[in-house]
Amino acid sequence: MLGFRSPIRLCKLSALGSAPLLPISRPKLFSTAVARYAADMETVNTTERLARLRQLMQEHKVDVYIVPSEDSHQSEYIAPCDGRREFISGFSGSAGTAIVSMTKAALSTDGRYFNQASKQLDSNWELLKRGVENVPTWQEWTTEQAEGGKVVGVDPSLITASGARSLEETLKRNGSSLVGISQNLVDLVWGKDRPAPPREKVRVHPDKFAGKTFQEKIADLRKELEKKKTAGFVISMLDEIAWLFNLRGSDIPYNPVFFAYAIITPTKAELYIDDDKITPEVVAHLGQDVVIKPYNSIFADAKALSEARKQEAGETASKFLLSNKASWALSLSLGGEEHVEETRSPIADAKAIKNEVELAGMRACHIRDGAALIEYFAWLENELVNKKTVLDEVDAADKLERIRTKHDLFAGLSFDTISSTGPNGAVIHYKPEKGTCSIIDPDAIYLCDSGAQYLDGTTDVTRTFHFGKPTELEKKAFTLVLKGLIAIDTAVFPKGTSGFALDALARQYLWKEGLDYLHGTGHGIGSYLNVHEGPIGIGTRVQYTEVPIAPGNVISDEPGFYEDGKFGIRIENVIMAREVQTTHKFGDKPWLGFEHVTMAPIGRNLIQPSLLSDLELKWVNDYHAEVWDKTHHFFENDEFTRSWLQRETAPITK
């Protein structure tokens, strides 16, 4: 699935001599209990909503109001009740910030969503294309609107402490100010139509899948806190809490997390969660090691904890550790910048390095998931080509989900399946909706980006097929993308190398043609957790320079190419970083490489063998032989699918 983006300028393709436009993505059921939460691409009339919001802004003496995408835990993907930015703007993409002044409104988003936002925003809104030359950032636009001593308001629980400080400093320079408004104004506009917060039960994630008890994880965390000489760690990121306590939930579609906070000190472990989500199994699991407290008491408790610490030790009191992604509201409750140490979360770092049990689970679940994909693509080709069945993009995506449910340890989808035909493949984060989506054209490129949650791991795979006769242009573009995927897969690099440094390997063959793609090359992946997981990744984000790739990291490898209005190409495998043996060891340091775990054929009729080196062609044939070896036993009683797999994994020659 497409992860994080790169600030690259858009351009058109002409006979593979210029450059491309956007990529794609579509969300789906996290479990059968979760209804689809997606809007179609139609424009939403926001006139009345904006009028009501501006009335509330006047009442609260605010001239400009910021509406972030995130929830109180800074989640990338959110529950329906937290879709405030979508409600006020009509834009349903996962990333973006809305800003409303008394006379104007703007929506800032990145290159994955330019196409979508331009279709969904009505005439009340200005689209700020992030990363495009001469287009202001949302902070710059806000500052301009606030000139002359105006007041900018924001819900302090929805913006990071560092983000608030940075904006506050910028506003001060032109005589303006930033204020936190605890009552969210968009919620007031939304009123009774706002979806209710989720109330799903929390589940224990067994140690046989986690590979480590939660007591061991907390002990390791306390060692880190001792090294940093901090008073404790206040945790707000949902996937970090789920990972730390070996618990899973269903509060956010596709992400097995639950709304909670936690505080870990040298002597206490406290979990803040609504009582109605706790089962006897969870109580028994946590035992005497964890105190369960009400979710809404976190801010009062954090304030009391900070004040008690100051009274005991005065000005020499050690600070509380807080993630640099934690909210402004949480930072203020701990006494603000002077009393907290904001840093990259030590839990994020630990979670990103999978243990041997988690790595084994990743290998196993990707083989089962590969079998599901093989059955699906064999079925799809047969329906489209042989039976001439009329299928739309949602029909196909639903079939894939049904196939996945048959496999062991399946627990839902990891994101909404991106099932896209022809030009829809060139739309970043494309969302097909029943009634408005396209009929799949067997004579056009079909791009499918999908993933699943299994109790032993999380999958994310993209395959691009053509069930007819692809053009030479399509084959050349596909092969250039494939060469980039192979370059990452076969990379060998010294310990300490970042994903930022590796990114160019995937783009080099497109760059030689003057081409590129508007998204990162890879993102971290959780173990039965979020399909997008930091802090590691492969791309041009500054954050990727901060954390080097390490053994145990699980990352996607997904270069692409997109010709707006025509087709999209992306090939995605999940890879795991590991130590490799090299002839030499320059600098006497370990050297790393990758192990791929995704097991699904790569569209062979789109490959132009003459563009592959001998080593690249060997990689393709070796990979397909591995796919056959690890998956063909699933089809002992399914001769049709077995024959399709045999054909698709047969050796390719020049």
From Swiss-Prot:
It comes from Neosartorya fischeri (strain ATCC 1020 / DSM 3700 / CBS 544.65 / FGSC A1164 / JCM 1740 / NRRL 181 / WB 181). Binds 2 manganese ions per subunit. It catalyses: Release of any N-terminal amino acid, including proline, that is linked to proline, even from a dipeptide or tripeptide. InterPro entries: Creatin/AminoP/Spt16_N (IPR029149), Creatinase/aminopeptidase-like (IPR036005), Creatinase_N (IPR000587), Pept_M24 (IPR000994), Pept_M24B (IPR033740), Peptidase_M24_C (IPR032416), Peptidase_M24B_aminopep-P_CS (IPR001131), X-Pro_aminopeptidase_P (IPR050422). Belongs to the peptidase M24B family. GO terms for biological process: proteolysis. Pfam families: Creatinase_N, Creatinase_N_2, Peptidase_M24, Peptidase_M24_C. Catalyzes the removal of a penultimate prolyl residue from the N-termini of peptides. Keywords: Aminopeptidase, Hydrolase, Manganese, Metal-binding, Metalloprotease, Protease. This is Probable Xaa-Pro aminopeptidase P. GO terms for cellular component: cytoplasm. Mn(2+) 2 binds at D449, D460, E572. Its cofactor is Mn(2+). One of its GO terms (molecular function) is metal ion binding. It comes from the Eukaryota. The keyword Ligase does not apply. Its EC number is 3.4.11.9. Mn(2+) 1 binds at D460, E558, E572. It is an enzyme of class 3 (hydrolase). CDD domains: APP. SUPFAM superfamilies: Creatinase/aminopeptidase, Creatinase/prolidase N-terminal domain.
